[in-house]
């Protein structure tokens, strides 16, 4: 009986292995190839979406292909892109930062108030502002890493605290563009325009592109970048491999704060004036998360790239500009972006499910 039972179990096991082999072979067809490609290169989806959008909007309005149109899109998404870079490195660690917009606006207020209220040279107030932004990011990181509080709750709280401090400290006063140009022109440096052929480009666009290139290199080609991915993918395994998770998290949130400070400096150049009530304090959070999600970075951490975020930010700019040139209602932009967000998260879930 034991022999017959063993033969029966061996037969079932053999058939199961054949079935699994057939199933795996089937999965490695077209669907399997798509899954493997997207898992390895998550920015492919936003790249395809952007190319299709450019083709469609170009067919609707040939002026969309003008070089000047691209330069305008880059100027529009520059600030969001820098905030998106800050958001991306946090989300790669399986966190989220809801305070990026508030830190950016408060940085502009600090630079403005130190220049006009205390009479400190603009070059020094810029350093003070970015350092303050880094400190705000450090506080987020310390609360998340050392006290092990949920990133969502921590940054939701600091978002409110920073926004309130922003209005209290500034007394809700706006510093006019002409006053900044006359007395603290260095604050508007990134708004300087130069021409490349027919395109009008600001230094702020260059700052955005350089920061994206630097962070893309750091995350893909340095040990620190690999540690960021490791902490987001599997923090326990990362610690077993010798990665100091707490230190990496604090560094990530601090760097995110510094990037928000740089975004604040660029924003002064883009808009000219300094206003504590700037809408970016609220919208910056949503826009940065949108660029990250559409760009293929997983909200669960450990997967994605800065290049994907860059493409996600461009997609938002392309849709806004394309629909505006087509004469469509602005609400269509929000509708289509919402669809893209849901589609991006759905694709991410599919990739994670199949990979599991």
Q: Which functions belong to the PLM regions below?
A:
Residues 60-72, 167-173, 218-225, 249, ...:
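Inter-helical junctions in multi-pass inner-membrane proteins, predominant
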Residues 55-118, 122, 142-148, 289-307, ...:
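Single transmembrane alpha-helix segments in multi-pass membrane proteins
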């Amino acid at each position: 009986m034991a022999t017959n039972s063993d033969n029966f179990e061996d037969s079932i096991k053999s058939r199961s292995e054949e079935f699994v082999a057939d199933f795996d072979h089937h999965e490695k067809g077209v669907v399997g190839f798509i899954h493997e490609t997207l898992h390895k290169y998550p920015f492919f989806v936003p790249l395809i979406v952007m190319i299709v959008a450019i083709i469609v909007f170009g067919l609707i309005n040939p002026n969309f292909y003008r070089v000047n149109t691209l330069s305008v899109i880059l100027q529009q998404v520059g600030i969001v892109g820098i905030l998106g870079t800050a958001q991306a490195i946090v989300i790669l660690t399986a966190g989220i930062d809801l305070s990026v917009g508030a830190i950016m606006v408060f940085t502009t207020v600090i630079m403005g108030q130190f220049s006009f209220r205390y009479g400190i040279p603009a070059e020094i107030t810029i350093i003070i502002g970015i350092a303050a932004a880094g400190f705000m990011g450090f506080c987020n990181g310390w609360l998340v890493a050392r006290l092990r509080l949920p990133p969502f709750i921590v940054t939701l709280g600091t978002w409110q605290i920073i926004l309130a401090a922003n209005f209290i400290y500034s007394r809700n006063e706006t510093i006019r563009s002409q006053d900044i140009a006359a007395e603290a022109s260095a604050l508007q440096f990134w708004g300087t325009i130069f021409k490349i052929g027919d395109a009008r480009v600001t230094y702020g666009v260059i700052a955005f592109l350089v920061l994206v290139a630097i962070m893309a290199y750091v995350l893909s080609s340095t040990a620190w970048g690999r540690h960021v991915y490791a902490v987001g993918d599997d923090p326990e395994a990362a610690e077993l491999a010798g990665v100091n998770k707490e230190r990496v998290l604090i560094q990530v949130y601090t760097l995110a704060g510094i990037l928000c400070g740089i975004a604040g400096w660029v924003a002064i150049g883009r808009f000219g004036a300094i206003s504590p009530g700037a809408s970016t304090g609220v919208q910056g959070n949503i826009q940065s998360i949108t660029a990250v999600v559409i760009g293929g970075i997983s909200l669960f951490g450990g997967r994605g790239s800065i290049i994907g975020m860059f493409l996600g930010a461009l997609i938002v700019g392309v849709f806004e500009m394309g629909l505006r040139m087509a004469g469509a209602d602005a609400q269509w932009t929000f509708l289509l972006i919402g669809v893209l967000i849901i589609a991006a998260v759905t694709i991410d879930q599919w990739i994670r499910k199949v990979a599991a």
